[in-house]
Amino acid sequence: GVGFKAGVKDYRLTYYTPEYKTKDTDILAAFRMTPQPGVPAEEAGAAVAAESSTGTWTTVWTDGLTSLDRYKGRCYDIEPVAGEENQYIAYVAYPLDLFEEGSVTNMLTSIVGNVFGFKALRALXXEDLRIPPAYSKTFMGPPHGIQVERDKLNKYGRPLLGCTIKPKLGLSAKNYGRAVYECLRGGLDFTKDDENVNSQPFMRWRDRFLFVAEALFKSQAETGEIKGHYLNATAGTCEEMLKRAVFARELGVPIVMHDYLTGGFTANTSLAFYCRDNGLLLHIHRAMHAVIDRQKNHGMHFRVLAKALRMSGGDHIHAGTVVGKLEGEREVTLGFVDLLRDDYIEKDRSRGIYFTQDWVSMPGVFPVASGGIHVWHMPALTEIFGDDSVLQFGGGTLGHPWGNAPGAVANRVALEACVQARNEGRDLAREGNEIIREACK
């Protein structure tokens, strides 16, 4: 026989390797697969491994010029999903050499770039990734992290409080700054630009930054506490985004903000580097996440987006609430909250954690609870999220019948009451409403 045999071949001959022992340096992925009727699970799993690594639909002569064995992704395990018909979890191991160092963009392009449109699959969802220290060490990660942020703000032993300024679109810069001042003066730690506030005709970014900085310094002088406002630096180009971050630094404010999914991981990582080099904290909003993570059987779970963000860099990230207006299952939410802030997270399928993740010493990210929460949720939030979190009340502050500042006071008083009650050993789940009522007096 001459050369090699061309033609379409079964992926599972090369890419389904149940005997494979995973390496410490491999990136591991768990995919929830729904194969098309008549496609065996092994073939589907192998196809996923092939298409997201070295495979193509036919044998090519250039395969002879490289070592497939060294570079191919391998589907090393498949398990049926309990309670679902024709759904499987496929485990795939990728050799580290397939990925560019320090690039979340390249990691995602490789793992989820192409394979989700694959004909043999009806649906595919990336449930989790195991990032080996050999790879995570090539990333800077969060510009500062939880501990450094607490030291910069001089705030300890409690969750931090935030508030999104509403109405999100339409206020002039001067009135916007006024709303910021009232909230911070009332006792909040942070206020926030809404994710869609960038630089629109009714309020250009530079004017907003100036009036907000004035509000910050005034409220700081009056309360003796460090205050912040997440100035949204998200823009249409990376250059413009960095220009806004530079101006924020020149004003001397403590924190800026970015929409990391719409802005993109490349822009986000650039901004994170700038923030670390210039002492700015970085707040991350997850606008667009539900487009990717809402469907159970197709897309990417938020825990994958959360891991990607911790690598790319951010000091805060929105992470659902467990109690407010947006959906979130408690155990699963706490699973990715721990993936954001802890050093070492044990595999625990009941919390949706498919792999043990060791971040070594990469800084942690504050999870932000935001969306439809108000003062009566405070005991539950304090209990669920613990101290290392940011609790954000938009309408729950500005909707106070007496105005913004009293709304802010109410939130701060409720938080302090819950933290004190917890520290005294009271049961927040049972006595929550009572604790809030006492605090109202």
UniProtKB/Swiss-Prot annotation:
<dbReference type="InterPro" id="IPR020888">
    <property type="entry name" value="RuBisCO_lsuI"/>
</dbReference>
<dbReference type="GO" id="GO:0016984">
    <property type="term" value="F:ribulose-bisphosphate carboxylase activity"/>
</dbReference>
<dbReference type="GO" id="GO:0009853">
    <property type="term" value="P:photorespiration"/>
</dbReference>
<dbReference type="Pfam" id="PF02788">
    <property type="entry name" value="RuBisCO_large_N"/>
</dbReference>
<dbReference type="InterPro" id="IPR017443">
    <property type="entry name" value="RuBisCO_lsu_fd_N"/>
</dbReference>
<feature type="binding site" description="in homodimeric partner">
    <location>
        <position position="114"/>
    </location>
    <ligand>
        <name>substrate</name>
    </ligand>
</feature>
<feature type="active site" description="Proton acceptor">
    <location>
        <position position="166"/>
    </location>
</feature>
<feature type="modified residue" description="N6-carboxylysine">
    <location>
        <position position="192"/>
    </location>
</feature>
<dbReference type="GO" id="GO:0000287">
    <property type="term" value="F:magnesium ion binding"/>
</dbReference>
<dbReference type="InterPro" id="IPR033966">
    <property type="entry name" value="RuBisCO"/>
</dbReference>
<feature type="site" description="Transition state stabilizer">
    <location>
        <position position="325"/>
    </location>
</feature>
<feature type="binding site">
    <location>
        <position position="195"/>
    </location>
    <ligand>
        <name>Mg(2+)</name>
    </ligand>
</feature>
<feature type="modified residue" description="N6,N6,N6-trimethyllysine">
    <location>
        <position position="5"/>
    </location>
</feature>
<dbReference type="GO" id="GO:0004497">
    <property type="term" value="F:monooxygenase activity"/>
</dbReference>
<keyword id="KW-0560">Oxidoreductase</keyword>
<feature type="active site" description="Proton acceptor">
    <location>
        <position position="285"/>
    </location>
</feature>
<protein>
    <recommendedName>
        <fullName>Ribulose bisphosphate carboxylase large chain</fullName>
        <ecNumber>4.1.1.39</ecNumber>
    </recommendedName>
</protein>
<keyword id="KW-0488">Methylation</keyword>
<comment type="subunit">
    <text>Heterohexadecamer of 8 large chains and 8 small chains; disulfide-linked. The disulfide link is formed within the large subunit homodimers.</text>
</comment>
<feature type="binding site">
    <location>
        <position position="318"/>
    </location>
    <ligand>
        <name>substrate</name>
    </ligand>
</feature>
<feature type="binding site">
    <location>
        <position position="168"/>
    </location>
    <ligand>
        <name>substrate</name>
    </ligand>
</feature>
<feature type="binding site">
    <location>
        <position position="194"/>
    </location>
    <ligand>
        <name>Mg(2+)</name>
    </ligand>
</feature>
<keyword id="KW-0456">Lyase</keyword>
<keyword id="KW-0601">Photorespiration</keyword>
<feature type="binding site" description="via carbamate group">
    <location>
        <position position="192"/>
    </location>
    <ligand>
        <name>Mg(2+)</name>
    </ligand>
</feature>
<keyword id="KW-0503">Monooxygenase</keyword>
<dbReference type="GO" id="GO:0019253">
    <property type="term" value="P:reductive pentose-phosphate cycle"/>
</dbReference>
<dbReference type="InterPro" id="IPR036376">
    <property type="entry name" value="RuBisCO_lsu_C_sf"/>
</dbReference>
<keyword id="KW-0113">Calvin cycle</keyword>
<comment type="function">
    <text>RuBisCO catalyzes two reactions: the carboxylation of D-ribulose 1,5-bisphosphate, the primary event in carbon dioxide fixation, as well as the oxidative fragmentation of the pentose substrate in the photorespiration process. Both reactions occur simultaneously and in competition at the same active site.</text>
</comment>
<dbReference type="Pfam" id="PF00016">
    <property type="entry name" value="RuBisCO_large"/>
</dbReference>
<keyword id="KW-1015">Disulfide bond</keyword>
<keyword id="KW-0150">Chloroplast</keyword>
<dbReference type="InterPro" id="IPR020878">
    <property type="entry name" value="RuBisCo_large_chain_AS"/>
</dbReference>
<dbReference type="InterPro" id="IPR000685">
    <property type="entry name" value="RuBisCO_lsu_C"/>
</dbReference>
<keyword id="KW-0120">Carbon dioxide fixation</keyword>
<feature type="binding site">
    <location>
        <position position="370"/>
    </location>
    <ligand>
        <name>substrate</name>
    </ligand>
</feature>
<keyword id="KW-0479">Metal-binding</keyword>
<dbReference type="InterPro" id="IPR036422">
    <property type="entry name" value="RuBisCO_lsu_N_sf"/>
</dbReference>
<comment type="similarity">
    <text>Belongs to the RuBisCO large chain family. Type I subfamily.</text>
</comment>
<keyword id="KW-0460">Magnesium</keyword>
<feature type="binding site">
    <location>
        <position position="164"/>
    </location>
    <ligand>
        <name>substrate</name>
    </ligand>
</feature>
